[in-house]
Amino acid sequence: MKLNFSIEYRTEWGQNVEVELCFLSSEGKTHWQRIPLETGDGLIWKGLCMLKARSRQFRYTYIITDSNVQSDTGEGILRREWDVVPRLFPADDARTYFFFDHWRDVPEASYCFTDAYEVANGLKKQASASVALFPRTFLFRVLAPGLAEGERVALVGDQPTLGNWDEERALPMMPSGHGEWLISISADGLRLPFQYKYIKVGQDGSVRWEDGPNRQSPLNGQWSMVNGQWVLALSDGTIRLEVPRWKVAGLVVPLFSLRSEGSQGVGDFGDLKEMIDWTAMAGMHAIQLLPIYDTTQSRTYTDSYPYNAISVHALHPIYADLRRLPLKDKKAMASFQKKWQKLNALPALDYVEVIKMKEEYLHLLYEEERQSPMLNGQWSMFNGQIADWLLPYCVFCHLRDTYGTSQFSKWKKLSSYNRSAVTKYAESHSKEVGYYAFVQHLLHTQLAEAAEYARSRRVFLKGDLPIGISPQSVEAWHEPHLFHMDMSAGAPPDDFSRTGQNWGFPTYDWERMAEDGYRWWRQRLGGMSQYFSAYRIDHILGFFRIWQIPKGSPTALLGQFSPALPLSVGEIESYGMPFEPELFVEDATQPDRWHPRIGVIGEEAWRRLPKYEQDAFIRLYEDFYYRRHNDFWASQAMKKLPALIDASNMLVCGEDLGMVPACVGPVMQRLGILSLEIQAMPKTYGVPFAKLHENPYRSVDTIFTHDMPTLRLWWKENRERTQLYYNNVLEHDGTAPSELFGWLCEEIVAHHLNSPSMLCLISLQDWLSIDESLRNPNLEEERINVPANPKHYWRYRMHLPISKLLEAKALNERILMLIERSERA
């Protein structure tokens, strides 16, 4: 089988175009191959590949590589095509294939190809269509985002075979899944060259022709001279039609915060299904959760922090719905029910007692069920699907519990990971290690059911992708080579913390991760996509650069951005000031290269400088942090983020708050990543409040995040700020009321819903603030996190059961009316 590739792409000096080919052999094995292309003019790149192995199907994508880096791994890849909808073809060893392609950037309407869009619009997953191949075949492919249920695509052109421009004789195309349509036509019925267009056909037969000039077939070429059978594939990008803007409203709530009459002291996967009912009833289409992964390290309240997981894959046992898992021992069952009723009556989560009770229960359940033939069959299948992470996780958990610590350096056995030794350990402790796999199987089953239920109610789940991993995690033990274990990630000083934030997470070794095409990230996101249709990248700035702090530093003030372009002493002096070591921090990897010390302006070391040196340092400081790195950091992000986007069909959202370089917005826009917009944290310097009507369409609007106070709490925190908001934003005269009344809450919520943002996601507390009879009278109880307190106890729970929300007719009708008026229903 011969594959001939041709693509138009204008490269820069030192760049090459290559094809990344993946084919499935007749034995079911997947093979990868890189094919370098050649060019005579720097614009048209061509190449030939001979596939000798018998194949079922193949797919390919184009990449741009650095000619100075010779590698078959991910090293040297400068850019990738958008590949969410793959170029997938049936293989026929007797044929020659010709591909006439254009580089695929992220489409304007890339959100239409996501699971979130599919779920919210109630679209059914389309099975891939198979098309007939003739002895000589033209194969047309086009993307058609934003089609309504029942709409389809057809092809019409200037020849009898193509309908002679008669829309009633247009050739219906077949959906191939994820918004792509295709059709095969015998070349024997076509005269070259020919012209054609795509049309959209409505369920009622109405027709809409695509905009722009007619499309042109390629002229006669080498393909027409081939003896035997051939396929010429025309990948035509996206149909040229305007896509209606899609806007939805949704709910933000931590899973642990949910409460039902049957909860066991914490929100669980069963409660999630009940909350899905309320979300759908109120006209919303999304639920955003905090991370739900296992954080079990010390079994103290500090494990309540959801961003310090011991695994990026394993779900937290605390979220098991025990109502679905009854014990055979009726006496024990009754005893546990009394315990969880007491825990559920508490106003806040008692993390220590809840996890203690749930683990005790799950151990008893394991003893009762582990010999079950049905369970063993399901369990074996589950283990086989995820063995890459499950075995290390299960052994890690058993060793943690054996030695009483998750600090694996203190373990007497297997303090360093060894695959064969870990496998032998699991075999010799199969019963004990098997418990953790058993629990993960139960959790996976319950969450998968909840996700499928959400899909049936046209509600999509949005997950949270933490920026870091715990230094005491499975990943740090299993694959330490992927991380800088001697460094910690954090954030420079900002509105949340004057000394910055030291999160304690090791930073990523991006060069090592690139060697296998970011396998670690692809597996992580593939796991998330089993449950979620969208996700939030926590601190997306970390994919451009990370605030890196030497491990053990008490604060983040001694950190520096990595990667970076630090200054030489000569560069510093070129700003018109002598080198003052107190104002700088030496680069961690490059001796005699310097970073201006973050936040030093205004401190004693800066104040004692002469005025002209103060001004020179301010120029240097602003240039270094806001201009010098823009192109460099953008190029770093463009190496990493496309791999994340292509790893799944989830809608990608970024948390881009804080000290945001100018390059971040354009890169997110280019990749179709939704930004985060918070009116009280404007991205324009010196402006007290952002203007909601200026929000970009590709964004998530929210009133406040989990790191901030709720709307009512914020209203009371700063009277001067509240008065400014009341007069200038809400445009009310007079003195702002000291308490935020329900009608004012509703007005604020309506303003946010009416913003141009694609998603408007509002916290449960702020939705409930509309109704003075339902909202929590204790404002402080609604606070989820206080970032300035690294030991904060994450324990907020809603003060009333979900059933009360389902019965709250007045509130639900009010919310539905607001959503419908904002065209988000």
Q: Each predicted region: which residue ranges?
A:
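Structural preference for beta-strand elements that scaffold enzyme active sites
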Residues: V248-V252, A286, R458-K462, A534-R536, ...
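Aromatic-rich carbohydrate-binding modules that target alpha-glucans
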Residues: K2, E8-S55, T65-A91, A144-L192, ...
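Acidic/aromatic-lined carbohydrate-recognition and catalytic surfaces
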Residues: R240-P480, E511-G527, I546
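Conserved alpha/beta catalytic core and glycan-binding cleft of carbohydrate-active enzymes
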Residues: Q371, E613-R627, D631-L774, N778
